[in-house]
Swiss-Prot record:
It is found in: Plastid, Chloroplast. Binds 1 Zn(2+) ion per subunit. It comes from Physcomitrium patens (Spreading-leaved earth moss). The keyword Metal-binding applies. In plastids the minimal PEP RNA polymerase catalytic core is composed of four subunits: alpha, beta, beta', and beta''. When a (nuclear-encoded) sigma factor is associated with the core the holoenzyme is formed, which can initiate transcription. The gene is rpoC2. This is DNA-directed RNA polymerase subunit beta''. PANTHER family: DNA-DIRECTED RNA POLYMERASE SUBUNIT BETA. It catalyses: RNA(n) + a ribonucleoside 5'-triphosphate = RNA(n+1) + diphosphate.
Length: 1330
């Protein structure tokens, strides 16, 4: 007996009790433990241990640990504000920082108690294992730590206080959900564990040890592990299935139990593996034998006959269910959890490696790192030392080449060999301010959300929200102010007029749901002027597709013609013939289908030819209608056949049924079936189009175009489906429409011609399926008109205007195309003045007071109107840029002040009932040069600057003695602005105020350019908070530069950057207005999971119920390597297929046991393998019959016992074909030999009715049915059946010994007789020869 001289905690007590039982037995062990209990009570009484609040001592290191964690959190928040990390990376940093702080504080508790107060009651109770755990004490004297929200996500605000210090109100509210969830989870887990125990006991309640040896020859191979006591402990108490030989010497024989000494010997001799017996391989049908079960865990010796090991196994697995948790790990990302080890530097030095062998990436915390493709050689150099090391492939490098590293610094993280289980999780990012969305990265429209504002981010980039006050009331039909207008406080912004008369135009309004907003007009004819006469060139009906501003660029599509002969009403497949198609999508190759409301690509036809449509009949049914389908898949039906009760086939053809998402798609392919004689020779004709008159299979001639499709149903059933094909021809017309430019537009230059080219587009790819809804049609070919002109002309835009001409009292609509000349400021060298001419037009409207109601929206603050740059939105959406959204930065001074906008030009507006309303509208006669003022549309910064100080008048009523000139003199103040040249360098200009002498003429003199140029600040440039440039002060806010003044001050529009990774989903369009709290981005990231999304008790239940967890095997590569060794021996053998099925079933049993053990061991629960093996044995004890056996009486698909099937196959002449099946514990409980047990479990009425109809007999073999009927349960060492079984076993052994002795005696007699006969035979033969 060993002498213990140490602290006896829970683990030490367990080891002591185990050794006492092994050496002295249970009786003496009970006496010794009773003495230990008495000593413990005596010492506890003398110590008088009590627990008070003063015994809760907080570790002194807590304050600086929390301070350090807060500093790390502040740094993370700063990087997030700068846009360097996104929300998920920030959350990971906070979680791991506070988790590490909490764990370090937990480790500091025990040393602190030992040094300050070793006899502290809290310390003695918790760390001895008597009461309480380390985690519970940590919440009393350490910190509460991180908590989860109702969605299961971890809250990034930890509870820094403990229960000794007391929680604040915020901390208490945060902890409420987690605390209540713990109570609820405990109750739920208790009930779930109870029900799981009931199901487990139900499936194995009849398993009793009845025999000593079942005589099985099968075994299970296990490997003893070095220095792993827990895994080797499961070998102790098992029975050997084969002899063990070490160097030719037998150290253990078959049917010998494995003891601790034998395991130690196997480890010392480095035995690779041994064969043991298991309940999985026991040959007994209803019971189990002693040798397959092994030792009793209670007594430490061989299990006795009559023990109800099934009940023990069920309770052993179900009882620890309350200890399992339901938590999910909330960290993840690049290499999270799959880091095998860290590589550290041995000394200070400079690290060097090949930079071409690595590529950059981001760590899970957003820090820069590099991944090596192959094994990377790294050299660390110092003045006196040189160290070489190899970093494995796919490892993460945390340093750069030629960087100085310190001793013990982590330079790389090595990836684990087995990747952990992860799941993809979405995290929503919400806007912190109202404003306008902007992005600069490449964003593509999501194909899954064609008709929405969902976009996908191709690569990592920033999403900006430009600040602005959002007006929630957007129902106003008319806005007084235009983009960039200055707005005073309490002035009307917009007006809504109800019940008034308005002019009706001859064209439709904008389609706001279109991605490319446009004006669509119908019934226009294109005319060409020849000899002063108009001749009609195009008589078709074109649909004009024009921008809002009426400006077209070169090669723009402005009209579309849908030819009726290319319009189809039946579904089918498109097949290209000899047409040549440009498959590269360009600017004009995307359009929106108004009928299907989807955006599709279109492909330009380069060469005329033909294409084909393979017609099909398609029906889509929901999942609930699957039972009403009356036709079979891969069948051939005639026209008029009922497909469902309400649908009949219109054509004769081949039926294909496929499941598409949650619906079923039924396709009927018209045609005829042909079975070729030579399949290999005719297989080359698969998928080809055959013209009329050509031979098919050297037997028939085609009358029309046909398509051959090879269909394979099985190995021996394949044929050709001859399908009809509809031909469509494409013919080009190479006569472009030419329109001359009116002479008055360009008198001095040579006349230039505008060309309208006709281009045909096909809307579907080759082999693409076309599905058409009932009562609809789809266009296949579009004819488009493209505007073009001579390339020598330096004109980039053309303007389209509409004209109404009255001819003989009939008004007809025409349109005119004019080329637009851009104003070039630098070409006017002689004249330094640019004159802007504005025309005031008077309009008279007489409005009846009874029919008109006016609603005005008043401004709450003064600022600047900002129209969003997204053209998909209606005009009534607008932002007001107030001084709270702008700030001015003086580059020489670090002070910050609000922007004072002096450019105040207002619009005139008056309203008087039953009188003339006078409105003065300002219109530009020509485009003005682009100023570097406040930004307009952000898509094209250099072409969107306007002089907003001269646009509108303020909305005020006009008095009778009103003077416009006096008002203008008071309001207008012209500032000094900048221009941008092509190189985007800032150039200073001076704009001075000019006295207004004429109402129709303003002039602004422009002086020479300034000499100073700089490239430090560009208009429209985005920058983050904390940016510092050269000698200028640091920017204190993130934003966008929207104006630059001559005093070197910047006007900055406040903005908020959000970092998003590639693959993120953006929920708004470019330039769209978003409100505070709206969803901006959905980040997709990976999160660790423990084997599966379901964990703990639900995971165990999922495995025991045999539910599908993964469609593909997790350890596919490893399993294939192991099984391949055995499979190679079976290929080419008739029995190989049967043996492979048996091996796969045995391997599945072992894998299922390991998976269940993995869940329990991850939670610190140890269960003997033999208990789980008994459950798995019952789950795999049934097989499915495959064929209808008239002689054996089994139906196809019937569940029978595996042992019964093997026994009948040995007895019957005709074998029963069957396949193995894995049943869940619930289904296995409902498929037993006792219908009484099944009825008492579930579905009582169904089970009893089925048993009555089949005439089943219950032989009362199990425990449950005997309890129900009040009989004696057939278990226990004193049971009559067990005693009779023991007597029968003894008599059987005696009989076997007698038979063996008789057999040996008869064999000896036979040997002597054979020897005597052989001697006499040889002597006679020799005598004859002589």
């Amino acid at each position: 007996m060993l002498f213990y001289n140490k602290v006896m905690d829970r683990t030490a007590i367990k080891q002591l009790i185990s050794r006492l039982i092994t050496h002295f037995g249970i009786t003496y062990t009970t006496y010794i433990l009773d003495q230990l209990k008495t000593v413990g009570f005596k010492q506890a009484t003398q110590a008088a241990i009590s627990l008070g609040i003063d015994d809760l001592l907080t570790a002194p290191s807590k304050s600086w640990l929390i301070q350090d964690a807060e500093q790390q959190g502040y740094i993370s928040e700063k990087h997030y504000r700068y846009g360097n990390v996104h929300a998920v990376e920030k959350l990971r940093q906070l979680i791991e920082t506070w988790y590490a702080t909490s764990e370090y504080l937990k480790q500091e508790m025990n040393p602190n108690f030992r040094m300050t107060d070793p006899l502290n009651p809290v310390h003695m109770m918790s760390f001895s294992g008597a009461r309480g755990s380390t985690s519970q004490v940590h919440q009393l004297v350490g910190m509460r730590g991180l908590m989860s929200d109702p969605q299961g996500q971890i809250i990034d605000l930890p509870i820094q206080s403990n229960f000794r210090e007391g929680l604040s109100l915020t901390e208490y509210i945060i902890s409420c959900y987690g605390a209540r969830k713990g109570v609820v989870d405990t109750a739920v887990r208790t009930s779930d564990a109870g029900y799981l125990t009931r199901r487990l006991v139900e499936v194995v309640q009849h398993i009793v040890v009845r025999k000593v040896d079942c005589g099985t020859s099968e075994n299970i191979f296990v490997t003893p592990l070095q220095n792993n006591y827990k895994k080797n402990n499961k070998l102790i108490g098992r029975i050997l299935a084969d002899n063990i030989y070490i160097n030719g010497r037998c150290i253990a024989i078959r049917n010998q139990d494995i003891t601790t000494n034998l395991v130690i010997s196997l480890i010392n001799f480095q035995r690779k593996g041994i064969f043991i017996r298991s309940p999985l391989i026991c040959k007994s049908m209803l019971w189990i034998c002693q040798l397959c079960y092994g030792w009793s865990l209670t007594h430490g010796n061989l299990i006795e006959l009559g023990e109800a090991v099934g009940i023990i196994a069920g309770q052993s697995i179900g009882e620890p269910g309350t200890q399992l948790t339901l938590r999910t790990f909330h960290t993840g990302g690049v290499f999270t959890g799959d880091i095998a080890e860290h590589i550290r530097t041995p000394f200070n030095g400079i690290i060097q490696f090949d930079t071409n062998s690595v590529y950059p990436t981001r760590t899970r915390h957003g820090h820069p790192a590099w991944i090596c493709n192959n094994n990377l050689s790294v050299v660390i150099k110092s003045k006196k030392k040189l160290h070489n090391l190899v970093i494995p492939t796919q490892s993460l490098l945390l340093v750069q080449s030629n960087q100085y590293v310190e001793s013990k610094q982590v330079i790389a993280e090595v990836r684990a060999k087995t990747s952990p289980f992860k799941e993809k999780v979405q995290k929503y990012i919400y806007s912190n301010l109202s404003g306008e969305m902007h992005w600069s990265s490449k964003v593509q429209h999501s194909s899954e959300y064609i008709h929405s504002n969902v976009h996908l981010l191709r690569k990592t980039g920033h999403i900006w929200i430009l600040a602005g006050n959002f007006d929630k009331d957007n129902k106003f039909s008319f806005i007084f102010y235009q983009n960039q207008d200055k707005l005073d406080n309490k002035l009307p912004i917009a007006k809504q007029t109800l019940n008034y008369f308005q002019l009706k135009e001859h064209f439709l309004n904008n389609f706001w749901n279109s991605i490319y907003s446009s004006i669509i007009l119908y019934n226009y004819r294109f005319l060409e002027k020849k000899n002063n006469k108009y001749e009609k060139k195009l008589l078709f009906q074109f649909m004009l597709k024009l921008p809002k501003n009426g400006i077209l660029k070169q090669n723009d599509i402005f009209a579309i013609f849908n030819d009726p002969k290319y319009r189809i009403k039946n579904s089918g497949i498109i097949k290209y013939g000899n047409i040549k198609v440009d498959l590269i999508n360009k600017k004009n190759d995307i359009f929106e289908d108004q009928k299907t409301k989807t955006v599709r690509p279109r492909y330009k036809i380069l060469k005329e030819g033909n294409f084909f449509l393979l017609p099909e009949e398609v029906y889509i049914l929901d999942q609930s209608s699957f039972s009403s389908i009356l036709v079979k898949n891969n069948s051939f039906i005639k026209a008029g056949t009922k497909i469902t009760f309400n649908i009949s086939s219109k054509i004769t053809g081949f039926v294909k049924i496929k499941k598409k998402f949650n619906n079923f798609k039924i396709k009927i392919l018209p045609g005829s079936i042909y079975y070729p004689k030579e399949k290999q020779k005719n297989f080359k004709q698969n998928g080809i189009l055959i013209p009329p008159g050509e031979k098919i299979f050297e037997q028939f001639r085609a009358k029309n175009w046909i398509y051959l499709e090879w269909i394979v149903l099985s190995k021996d059933n394949s044929f050709f489906l001859i399908r009809p094909a509809i031909e469509y021809k494409i013919i080009f017309n190479d006569n472009p429409l030419t329109l001359p430019i009116p002479f008055y537009l360009d008198l001095l230059k040579e006349q230039k011609k505008i060309k309208i080219q006709t281009v045909k587009y096909i809307l579907y790819e080759d082999s693409e399926e076309v599905e058409i809804n009932p009562d609809t049609d789809i266009q296949l070919i579009q004819t488009c008109l493209i505007l073009n002109w001579e390339t020598k002309v330096f004109i980039k835009e053309a303007h389209i205007s509409f004209i109404k001409i009255r001819i003989n009292k009939i008004i007809k609509n025409f349109f005119q195309i004019n080329l637009i000349e851009n104003i070039n400021l630098m070409n006017k060298k002689k004249n330094n003045n640019i004159i802007l001419n504005y025309l005031f037009k008077k309009k008279r409207y007489i409005i009846n007071q009874k029919d008109c109601e006016k609603i005005l929206l008043l401004s709450k603050t003064w600022g600047i109107i900002r129209t969003p740059s997204n053209k998909n939105q209606e005009k009534s959406f607008f932002l007001i840029l107030s001084p709270f959204n702008l700030f001015q930065t003086i580059l020489f001074d670090k002070t910050k002040q609000n922007l004072k906008i002096e450019n105040n030009v207002e619009k005139l507006f008056t309203y008087e009932p039953k009188k003339i309303i006078k409105t003065f509208n300002i219109e530009k006669r020509k485009n003005f040069v682009e100023f570097l003022g406040l930004l307009g549309y952000l898509q094209n910064i250099t072409k969107s600057f306007q002089l907003f100080s001269c646009k509108k008048f303020s909305d005020k009523s006009i008095p009778i003695n009103f003077s416009i000139i006096d008002n203008l003199k008071k309001k207008i103040k012209i500032s000094k602005w900048f221009f941008l040249n092509e190189n985007k360098k800032v150039q200073k200009f001076f704009l001075t105020q000019n006295t207004i002498l004429s109402l129709l003429n303003w002039s602004f003199p422009i002086f020479d350019l300034a000499k100073k140029k700089t490239q430090l600040f560009n208009l429209g440039h985005f920058f983050c908070d904390g940016l510092s440039i050269a000698e200028y002060p640091t920017f204190s806010e993130s934003g966008q530069i929207i104006a630059i003044y001559d005093d070197l001050s910047l006007v900055i529009r406040l903005a908020k950057p959000y970092l998003a990774t590639g693959g993120a989903i953006i929920h708004n369009n470019y330039g769209e207005i978003v409100k505070e709290g709206d969803i901006l981005i959905t980040l997709i990231y990976e999160r660790l999971k423990s084997g599966d999304i379901i964990q703990g008790l639900p995971k165990v239940e999922q495995l025991l119920e045999a539910r599908l967890t993964n469609p593909v095997s997790i350890n596919l590569e490893k399993g294939f390597g192991e099984w391949n060794k055995d499979m190679t021996n079976f290929f080419g053998s008739l029995w190989g297929y049967f043996l492979s099925a048996q091996i796969s079933m045995e391997q599945s049993q072992v894998n299922l046991v390991n998976q269940i053990q993995k869940v329990y061991r991850s939670q610190g629960v140890n269960i003997s393998d033999k208990h789980i093996e008994i459950i798995v044995r019952q789950m795999t004890s049934k097989v499915f019959t495959l064929e209808d056996g008239m002689t054996n009486g089994f139906l196809p698909g019937e569940l029978i016992e595996f042992a019964r099937a093997k026994r009948m196959n040995r007895a019957l002449e005709e074998v029963i074909p069957y396949k193995p099946v894995l049943l869940g514990i619930t289904k296995a409980s409902l498929n037993t030999q006792s219908f009484i047990s099944e009825a008492s479990f579930q579905e009582t009425t169904r089970v009893l009715a089925k048993a009555a109809l089949r005439g089943r007999i219950d032989w009362l073999k199990g425990l449950k049915e005997n309890v129900i009927l009040g009989g004696i349960i057939p278990t226990g060492t004193g049971c009559e059946e067990v005693l009779w079984q023991i007597t029968l076993e003894k008599q059987k052994n005696i009989l076997l010994k007698k038979n063996k002795s008789k057999l040996f005696h008869n064999k000896v007699k036979d040997i002597f007789l054979y020897k005597k006969l052989s001697i006499s035979f040889t002597s006679e033969k020799i005598h004859k020869n002589y």
